[in-house]
């Protein structure tokens, strides 16, 4: 267990959710995104802490026809001031917050 400056974190404890509509993503969660019914938007936290991590999975393998849009909520993604559109079938990736200059970075694919 460690303190990240805001909350106590327990390593190895992970939270999973299945989503099929637009949602506000929470730090430390893993999302199985089902876009069978149409594209969805995940809105990132507005004030994340350094090292905050969120993971997304294309559980239905439909991002190619119904994309996941990751709304940056004021912070850069990959250093860019644009939302991230993911349209690769079967995509799975994590975003980690690196600070206000470069914002959310793709940590793993």
What does each of the following model-derived ranges do?
Residues 1-3, 88-99:
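Extracellular disulfide-bonded cysteine-rich modules/repeats
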Residues 7-71, 100-109:
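Exposed extracellular interaction/assembly regions and N-terminal maturation sites
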Residues 71-80:
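Short edge-strand/loop segments of extracellular domains
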Residues 81-86:
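Beta-strand-rich interaction surfaces with strong enrichment in secreted/lumenal proteins
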């Amino acid at each position: 267990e460690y303190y990240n400056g805001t909350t106590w974190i327990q390593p190895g404890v992970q939270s999973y959710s299945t989503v099929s509509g637009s949602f506000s993503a929470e730090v430390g969660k893993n999302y199985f995104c089902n876009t069978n019914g149409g594209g969805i938007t995940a809105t990132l936290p507005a004030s994340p802490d350094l090292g905050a991590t969120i993971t997304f999975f294309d559980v239905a393998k439909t991002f190619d026809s119904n994309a996941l849009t990751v709304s940056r909520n004021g912070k850069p993604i990959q250093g860019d001031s644009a939302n991230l559109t993911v349209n690769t079938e079967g995509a799975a990736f994590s975003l980690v917050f690196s600070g206000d200059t470069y914002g959310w970075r793709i940590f793993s694919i």
